[in-house]
Curated annotation (Swiss-Prot):
Task performed by this protein: Probable effector of the planar cell polarity signaling pathway which regulates the septin cytoskeleton in both ciliogenesis and collective cell movements. Together with FUZ and WDPCP proposed to function as core component of the CPLANE (ciliogenesis and planar polarity effectors) complex involved in the recruitment of peripheral IFT-A proteins to basal bodies. Binds phosphatidylinositol 3-phosphate with highest affinity, followed by phosphatidylinositol 4-phosphate and phosphatidylinositol 5-phosphate.
Protein name per the record: WD repeat-containing and planar cell polarity effector protein fritz homolog
GO biological process: auditory receptor cell morphogenesis; camera-type eye development; cilium assembly; cilium organization; circulatory system development; digestive system development; embryonic digit morphogenesis; establishment of planar polarity
Entry keyword set: Bardet-Biedl syndrome, Cell membrane, Cell projection, Ciliopathy, Cilium, Cilium biogenesis/degradation, Cytoplasm, Cytoskeleton, Disease variant, Intellectual disability, Membrane, Obesity, Repeat, WD repeat
Assembly description: Component of the CPLANE (ciliogenesis and planar polarity effectors) complex, composed of INTU, FUZ and WDPCP. Interacts with CPLANE1.
Impact reported for R55K: In a patient with Meckel syndrome compound heterozygous for mutations in CC2D2A; no effect on the assembly of the CPLANE complex
Disease per UniProt entry: Bardet-Biedl syndrome 15: A syndrome characterized by usually severe pigmentary retinopathy, early-onset obesity, polydactyly, hypogenitalism, renal malformation and intellectual disability. Secondary features include diabetes mellitus, hypertension and congenital heart disease. Bardet-Biedl syndrome inheritance is autosomal recessive, but three mutated alleles (two at one locus, and a third at a second locus) may be required for clinical manifestation of some forms of the disease. Congenital heart defects, hamartomas of tongue, and polysyndactyly: A disease characterized by a constellation of anomalies including tongue hamartomas, polysyndactyly, and congenital heart defects such as atrioventricular canal and coarctation of the aorta.
WD repeat coordinates: 326-374, 375-414
Main location: membrane
Phenotype upon changing L205F: In a patient with Bardet-Biedl syndrome compound heterozygous for mutations in BBS12; no effect on the assembly of the CPLANE complex
Amino acid sequence: MRREFCWDAYSKAAGSRASSPLPRQDRDSFCHQMSFCLTELHLWSLKNTLHIADRDIGIYQYYDKKDPPATEHGNLEKKQKLAESRDYPWTLKNRRPEKLRDSLKELEELMQNSRCVLSKWKNKYVCQLLFGSGVLVSLSLSGPQLEKVVIDRSLVGKLISDTISDALLTDSFIILSFLAQNKLCFIQFTKKMESSDVNKRLEKLSALDYKIFYYEIPGPINKTTERHLAINCVHDRVVCWWPLVNDDAWPWAPISSEKDRANLLLLGYAQGRLEVLSSVRTEWDPLDVRFGTKQPYQVFTVEHSVSVDKEPMADSCIYECIRNKIQCVSVTRIPLKSKAISCCRNVTEDKLILGCEDSSLILYETHRRVTLLAQTELLPSLISCHPSGAILLVGSNQGELQIFDMALSPINIQLLAEDRLPRETLQFSKLFDASSSLVQMQWIAPQVVSQKGEGSDIYDLLFLRFERGPLGVLLFKLGVFTRGQLGLIDIIFQYIHCDEIYEAINILSSMNWDTLGHQCFISMSAIVNHLLRQKLTPEREAQLETSLGTFYAPTRPLLDSTILEYRDQISKYARRFFHHLLRYQRFEKAFLLAVDVGARDLFMDIHYLALDKGELALAEVARKRASDIDAESITSGVELLGPLDRGDMLNEAFIGLSLAPQGEDSFPDNLPPSCPTHRHILQQRILNGSSNRQIIDRRNELEKDICSGFLMTNTCNAEDGELREDGREQEIRDGGSLKMIHFGLV
């Protein structure tokens, strides 16, 4: 098998790529090969109407012995041998008591005739499906294959309505909401599961001795409304929410009270009872409401809003549950080009991704307060972030799929095949006949995933659910070199392997040194080491500056503990960059870097090399600067540090510098037509107080006079666009940011 298929998640492949927020020179498209994701599609279906081609070795379904499918090329037997050699079942067994084949047929018939209102993964092995009629289906997996299907009809005919809107499933209780009823159904289990292997064993509700209770809730009367439910991680708080109802009062209708106008309810669960604690009316129509994973009593909402100019926006709000009351404590307004139709947060909840009606994709970073914009090749009605926070998948109801990294660089994808043909999108409609739309796309993973990068859990299965079937998973072939992992470091290393340095730097720039310091250092070291091994060009020089600038000139000031932990190690890379500049006689940039570092030995290196090259004026300036540093150290009584002991000086050089004033930010009217997928980076700043900030130049007047004769400073190109956040975020302080002037970073 070819090397591309046995490498890690991203293999080398040719293709086009979206423009980067960093300036880039034209590349040789003939020899340049790019990363892509290699996948397999496993459909849990026995239907012979899917019409999967027998030559598609990347798509699998189950077959019936009694009804062999018609083959197009006569390769079905070879495909069967390939599947069985990989321990993929070709036909399902029907042994008692599971009777897997009959259970799957019953499930497919149920999906054709009933609406699935909820699908929840309890863990990596068990999925629960709840249908509007009250049927509860449990699926057990072994890898990408079905192992067991249990259909439970215990609730059928025992509920006040068969139009279930949403549901919450826990090990202790079930909560149901209804489309046309202002009531919540609370089903409490009086008996716990007696199983040594809770992950695998599937129990029916009848074995748990349940009791059913109903609770009245406020809300619109005599109206069919989608009432959604969410629960926190400790299972003691629940929110029930629905879209805003028009406030227009009818002449014969009574005036609604505040309680009846509310569309967000806070409920408490304690001692086997459910109680409505408080209610509130959101300012705008909510798109998504969920509890935070880190703070169990915080509620995150995304609401549709409009600006003063009637332009669409999205409000990212934080509500807190304080003394059984829910109240809004923070609002961040994100301008959009069109209305948002989908959203998703990453596991660490510091990034919000929005899909819009114009096929644009917006990513807002809470830490940097930066907004990224990309154009997708589909209508982003579904978004799902990988548990590692490295990639996100965007899907459409038409069955299209596209992958982006967390810096919004697109990643090509292809199914396992004989030929290497990666594409921007994966179109399921061209692979099999699906009679309904794609309605769910979810990574198979627990609710809370560790972000330390030390876990051994592998998350390589994406659950797919079409409205009337089939069900299935998309298996990502992650390979042995990454040990099945798909993290930020793994993607950056693969980008470096394919010489996609801009994409690697963009991911590094999106990472937070304060929370992911170890991963940031490994990634930055890999990028800088790769660039220092190559010939210095203006492009690579800018890449080195940007990579080191993620630590030395971050968008937000780093914590002191972070600086102290990594400054000594990173200063060695800064010194290597200095000598790399000298090696290629980049005296101007090397001198400015030496000024920032403030190390005597660096100026002496410039002095001796300038003498060898006949640059007498520069040699004299460097020698004088080294003498000044000697004099300053003697005057202050500080002993001169050795060449490798000045790691803190590069940081100290930036103390006192602050952000330049930002002008009025606006969304760019037109996207650049350079690639099929367009991309911008839009810097957002929330300014409390005066917007006029002054840049304090650290250089003294003597340096200005000396350097003006022979040094020429280069400035970076401005970023593609800027966008001021119309913010009401309360917790953000008015502070400056470390900024490097001589280093060539804006």
